[in-house]
From Swiss-Prot:
This is Anthranilate phosphoribosyltransferase. The keyword Metal-binding applies. Anthranilate 2 binds at residue 167. It catalyses: N-(5-phospho-beta-D-ribosyl)anthranilate + diphosphate = 5-phospho-alpha-D-ribose 1-diphosphate + anthranilate. InterPro entries: Anthranilate_Pribosyl_Tfrase, Glycosyl_Trfase_fam3, Glycosyl_Trfase_fam3_N_dom, Glycosyl_Trfase_fam3_N_dom_sf, Nuc_phospho_transferase. One of its GO terms (cellular component) is cytosol. PANTHER family: ANTHRANILATE PHOSPHORIBOSYLTRANSFERASE (PTHR43285:SF2). Binds 2 magnesium ions per monomer. Keywords: Amino-acid biosynthesis, Aromatic amino acid biosynthesis, Glycosyltransferase, Magnesium, Metal-binding, Transferase, Tryptophan biosynthesis. Its EC number is 2.4.2.18. Pathway: Amino-acid biosynthesis; L-tryptophan biosynthesis; L-tryptophan from chorismate: step 2/5. Its cofactor is Mg(2+). It is an enzyme of class 2 (transferase).
């Protein structure tokens, strides 16, 4: 038990913690020095009052420092969502990652099992024949050889074992629900990140700015998803050069049609993998257009495309040329190599 943490729990309930106070508090959590009651008390005090940018940044800083790091190629990007939107869509960010990698941009994707759908990124990749339970060294090999690597959160954040049981018992959202996209083990400086609430995109952009990100789009779909929506306008907070610009983005701005939300609702990992394979073969429809929209945004963030319409063209070529499909096959081979 940490006696030094106890007063901070009461403090957190009444005022924002300074960055130094918050870093100390999360150091206690990640070192296993806090009791389950102290962990729960701190997390709920923050949740009830509302976490600040400094508190998010402090937690992310400590979590990054304790993770198993990965070296990524220059210019690597992460394409990730917080999860937790409860919408059960097809695996859009996962498919987007392979399309972007097929366009020549290194993708260091951080992810986990299902949070907001029946099939999270790791579930879909496993169904596609990839081994996601690999360590940092193997991920580095994938990034260098294939230009894409998947970092399974539990394989890179061992300190989370101390707080996992408490999170499960609390059964409610805490600060940890948004830390995943802020704690990429490869330390990427560019990312396309979705949030389960529009109220999070500005604070998350401010956190990434404080942590040294160069360019990022934080997005929330108008259909309630943690990605750019193909059925409605989306909210965007774009970080570049330390400045944050907020705007609405409609699919038609990228030259794409609007589709009913129901057309991107997913199912089991096997069903989602089947849809993913069809997309890689060039099947048209709402799923492909949703992936093209998100891939276009990622290509803009990566400075691979000057605008969304050009990004859609590049992403379309990645699919139709077979480049995205080839990335899946190569990553499957590399992750299953003896």
């Amino acid at each position: 038990m940490s006696d030094r943490l106890k007063p901070l729990i009461g403090t957190a309930a009444t005022r924002p913690l300074t960055r130094e106070e918050a870093e100390f508090a999360f150091e206690c959590l990640f070192e296993g020095e806090a009791t389950p009651a102290q962990m729960g008390g701190l997390l709920m005090a923050l949740r009830t009052r509302g976490e600040t940018v400094d508190e998010y940044a402090a937690a992310a800083t400590v979590m990054r420092a304790k993770c198993h790091k990965v070296r990524a190629p220059h210019g690597a990007i992460d394409i990730v969502g917080t999860g937790g939107d409860g919408k059960g869509t097809l695996n859009i960010s996962t498919a987007t990652a392979f399309v972007v990698a097929g366009a020549g941009v290194p993708v260091a994707k951080h992810g986990n099992r299902n949070l907001s759908s029946k099939s999270g990124a790791a579930d879909a990749l496993t169904e596609m024949g990839l081994n996601v339970m690999i360590g940092p060294e193997r991920v580095e090999e994938c990034l260098m050889e294939a230009g894409i690597g998947f970092m399974m959160a539990p394989m890179h954040h061992p300190a989370m074992r101390h707080v996992g049981p408490v999170r499960a018992e609390l059964g409610t959202r805490t600060i940890f629900n948004i830390l995943g996209p802020l704690t990429n083990p490869a330390g990427v400086k560019r990312q396309l990140t979705g949030a389960f609430s529009p109220d999070l995109i500005r604070p998350m952009a401010e956190v990434l700015a404080a942590l040294g990100s160069e360019k990022a789009w934080l997005v929330h779909g108008g259909d309630g998803t943690d990605e750019l929506a193909i059925s409605a306008a989306s909210k965007v907070a774009a970080l570049e050069g330390g400045q944050i610009r907020e705007f609405d983005l409609h699919p038609e701005e990228a030259g794409l049609p609007v589709h009913p939300f129901e057309e991107i609702v997913g199912g089991t990992p096997a069903e989602n993998a089947q849809a993913f394979r069809a997309l890689l073969e060039g099947a048209p429809g709402a799923y492909r257009d949703a992936v093209l929209l998100n891939a276009a945004a990622a290509l803009v963030v990566a400075d691979r495309a000057p605008g969304l319409r050009e990004g859609v063209e590049i992403a379309t070529e990645s699919i139709l040329s077979g480049a995205a499909k080839a990335k899946v096959a190569l990553l499957a081979r590399l992750t299953n190599a003896a």
